[in-house]
Amino acid sequence: MADQATQHHLVLIIARDFASRLATPVFLVDARGSVIYFNESAERVLGRRFMEGSGMDAEEWSTVFAPSDDDGNPVGLADLPLGVAIREQHPDHRMLRITSIDGTERRIEVTAFPLFAHEDECLGAIAVFWEAPDAER
C-alpha cells in the first residue's frame, strides 16, 4: 500500500508525545527536515494547523513563515536554529521575526537541538519557541 504512514523511531514517537503535552510551542522534524509534528501552541503562533503542515519539507517550513532578523534581513534554512540542529547536529538559539499564515508578524525566540538515538545516529530535531518582546528598532 503506497500511502502507509511512515514508521518513526521510538525516540521521535516519544518526542512527539512530549510535545503534545506542553503548553510551550514545539516543532519536530525528522533527519531530512520533514515536519513530524507541531503542537497546538505552535499552531496558534504559526497560524497553521498541524494537519495542514504535516509533512512539510525543510525548504517549505524554512520559507513559508518568512523568517527574518530584527533588521528585516531574511534568515535562510542554514541559519535557522532548526536548520543548524539538523545540518550541524548541535543546539542553536536565535531571535527571529516570522509572519504567521494569517499575516500576523511575530518576534519569537527559538531554541533547537538534534535528537540522537545513539551518539552517531541523529533522527531529527526539535525546536521550542515562544513569543518575545519587540526590540527597539
Predicted regions and their residues:
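Beta-strand residues that line the small-molecule/cofactor-binding core
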Residues: 77, 105-107, 124
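Sensory-domain boundary/capping and coupling elements
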Residues: 13, 136-137
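Terminal output helix/cap of sensory domains in signal transduction proteins
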Residues: 53-100
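PAS/PAC sensory module
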Residues: 93-97, 107-110, 126
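PAS-family sensory domains
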Residues: 2, 121-132
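Sensory modules in modular signal-transduction proteins
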Residues: 6-34, 40
